[in-house]
Structures are given as C-alpha cells and as structure tokens.
Amino acid sequence: MIESVCFKLLIGQLSILAVKEGVVKISFENESMEKMEKWCRNHLGMGIVEGTDFTTEAKSQILNYLSGKRKSLNFPVVHLNTLFRKRVLEAERNIPYGQTRSYGEVAKMIGRPKAIRAVGSANANNPLPLYFPCHRIINANGTLGGFGWGVDVKQYLLDLESKSL
C-alpha cells in the first residue's frame, strides 16, 4: 500500500505519498482523496492508506526546508518518469539553492539544447516538486513562467530561498 500524509502550510495543503522504498509524489494541490487514489492505482497499481511509517522523514525535511533551515532534500524517492524527464529533473537538483536557470539552460545541461519545450513538459509533470526543484526554472527573459501549483507559490519558494542564503 501507499502511505499518505496531508498537512496545511502557509502556501496551502501539502500531500506526500510514499511506499517503503521512498516518496512517489509530493503535491501542493488540494487534491481529493479520489484523485490521489486514482493516480496511485494508475502509476503503481496500489491503493492509499493514511500513515507515517514512510512519510515521517520527508515531512520533517520539507518542513525544515520551508522554514529556511534546510537547503536541500535527501529522503529516498521512487522516480516514476521517462528517462528524458529523469535526466531533466536530476539536472535541476544541481541548481544551487537560491539560484535560477532558464528552460534553455537546463536543456543545455542535459546535452539537448533544442529541447526547451520538452524541459518545460518535464517540469509540468514533476511528481516530486521541492525534491526536484522545478520552481528554480524560469523563462529566458527572467519572468517566472509557469508552475503547477501557481506562480504565487513559485514566487514564495524563490523568495524563501533568496532570504535564507
């Protein structure tokens, strides 16, 4: 079974889904339990139970990150992505705390300089935001660009990181 824990933050509700091997999904959305259950069945073929055996460390690290006490997350994760998306998200983990890169710069980081839109798609489908810090990816002109949990949350995370340096 997949464990689920949900908790409220200043930026909204955060949910963590995890199996024994690691965290599979982090969500800032107020997703219904039915929607999360469907995601789990489609991606892992399992249902959800509320629990803390597999989510405690991730929750602790995320709370410390969001309070400015931690600059990176290192709890175990289960990467449910295509090879290309894995390359994009792993490259983004190398972007230092408090810094940003453009979609084009990330495309160059993975050796695919023309794959700018594909980098955007990988970020849009990132099941583990914060762990894979897609909020650090901005448009080439310096504007924020999109973010699955809203531009306000993206700005909040970037401001948090710049204040905690």
Name each model feature, range by range.
Residues 140-165:
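…primarily DNA-binding HTH/wHTH and HhH modules…
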